[in-house]
Each structure stands twice: as C-alpha cells, then as structure tokens.
Amino acid sequence: MSAADNNVVEKDPGAWRRRTLVLIPLVAFLALAALFMLRLGAGDPSRIPSALIGHPAPQTSLPPLPALERDGNAVPGIDSAAFKGEVTVLNVWASWCVPCREEAPLLMNLAADRRLRVAGINYKDEPDNARRFLGRYGNPFAANGIDRNGRAAIEWGVYGVPETFVVGRDGHIAYKLIGPITPDNLDKALKPAIEKALAAPKPAKGE
C-alpha cells in the first residue's frame, strides 16, 4: 500500500468522527420533533388536551349582543351560573373568522336538539358585524356574550377561534374542540362527548 493510501486510512477515522458529531444534534432534533408531533395527536391541534377538562367552567359574565333575537325573544348574555342544570355547547366565534362560517350549518343542526343548549362567546368583534354574520348564517345561540377585549377567552383557555366546549349539567367542562366543527369531528368526537354529558346523572339540588 502506498504512502498516499496510508494517509487516507489515517485521516478516515477523524473524518468519520466529525461527521458523527454533526449528525448527532440533527438526529436528536428530529427525534424531539417526532415526539412533539406525537404528543399533539399526530399534528391534529383539535386533540391538544385542555387543563380545564373536568373542572368547573370559568365564572364568566358577559353582556348580550344588542338587538339580537332568536325565535322572537331577546338573546341574553353569558352567565356561567346558568350552565348548571343542562348540557351546554359553548362556541367561541367571530364574524371575521372564516372557519366559523364553514361550521355555522353544523351549529344550527346542534341547536335543533332540544336536549341541550347552544351558547356563544363573540370574540373581539364589532356588534354590527356580529349581527350581520348571524343574520346571514343563522343564529344557533340561546345565549351569546360579547368578549370585546378577549379576557373571557383567556379564562376559558382559548387558543383561537373557533373553539367549542361541552359543559355538563354539573357546570364542569366535559370536552373541548380546538378549531372548526366538521362533519368528521362532529360525528367522531363532539357528538359522543355531548351524548356522554347527556347520559351523566343529574346533579343533586344544591350541588
């Protein structure tokens, strides 16, 4: 073997070690990224768990959207105390939210179920725009509160609009859906959560 070949052999171990040192951080980064995505439900943000699940709904009191009516009656604002005693689907929405338009027909279908109540939190919106939105896409809300500064959304742990919560008869949050309601997640996640809440025993008076 020539002297040149000896030099190549002598240099190879060092070059291999350098390449290994470069690859280790990359492999570690990819492993952490894969673990992160797995914990987020394989990239599905609607599966991010909420710390509020199983806990009482925030004590939220919000004024009503002026001049909003449903079935000829004025729609009241949001009062968390009113959640107790019936299953409530609470939707956080805004007129400027494009996905909110897409989920509107599904919310209207939910509102037709007399076993539950659909309520809304109108997030950082203009009242006129909000009324026009509901006039165009329909008003599913038996109660709707205005959250002009976004404080209530923070209390509810909202990441962005739309988001939907299921609140049980005991006033505890039973389920949270991040992102718009779709036919798929309605059938596979939201409706089962609603049915589970409806099947739960009614709380005793005073609880």
Summary of predicted features, one role per range:
Residues 1-67, 207:
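N-terminal targeting signals for export/organelle localization
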Residues 54, 59, 115-116, 141-142:
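A generic structural signal for alpha->beta connector loops
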Residues 60-88:
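A short beta-strand-turn-helix
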Residues 86-88, 93-96, 160:
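Short pre-active-site segment immediately N-terminal to redox-active cysteine/selenocysteine motifs
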Residues 89-91, 120, 166:
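Hydrophobic beta-strand core positions in alpha/beta domains
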Residues 101-138, 148-154, 188, 207:
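Structural microenvironment flanking redox-active thiols in thiol-disulfide oxidoreductases
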Residues 135-140, 147-198, 206-207:
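Thiol/disulfide oxidoreductase modules built on the thioredoxin-like
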